[in-house]
C-alpha cells in the first residue's frame, strides 16, 4: 500500500487510493492484533503519507490520531527504528505553529539511528532537519553518509528515494 503509493502510483489520486487502502489494512490489522507494533506502524505510515500527499495543512485533522498511533507503536516496541522515522518526519513536516518541532524531529531521527545506523530514511530525515536549522556542514555529512551507505537496511527505499533525495539536496542551493 504505502510502497505501491510511493513507487508505482504516478498521480496523486493513485497515491491517495493506495494510502487509503493501506490505512484500511492497517486498521484491520490493529483490530486483529492490537498489541502488534507493526500493525500500528503500518497504519501510521499510510496515514502520514496520505496526509502528506493531500497536503499537510489540509490534513491537520489527522495529526492527533497520527501522534497517538506513533505513541502506541513506540509503547509496544521502543526498538522499532521505522517508528522513529515516522515520528521524526511528522515533526519535520508539520509547521511549528501547528505542533511540529525541528528539535523533536532531530531527537527522533537520532534515537532511530542509535537503533539502526543503516536506516537511510532516518539519516536523510536528520540531514533535512539539520539543513533547515542552518547546520549545513552537519547536514552535508549526514546526506553524504546516505549516499555512501554500503548496507542500507532497506535497499529498495535507499535506491528509489533516499539516495536520489540526498543527491538532490547536496547539489541544490543551500538553505
Give, region by region, the residue ranges found by the protein language model.
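"A position-specific structural signal for the A-helix of alpha-solenoid helical repeats
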Residues: 3, 42, 49, 86, ...
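Short coil/turn linking the two alpha-helices of tandem helical-hairpin repeats
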Residues: 3-12, 49-58, 90-99, 132-134, ...
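Terminal, low-structured helical/coil segments at or just beyond the last alpha-helical repeat
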Residues: 132, 136-175
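Canonical positions in the second alpha-helix
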Residues: 29, 72-73, 111-112, 145-146
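Structural signature of tandem alpha-helical TPR/SEL1-like repeats
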Residues: 10-24, 54-71, 97-111, 134-142
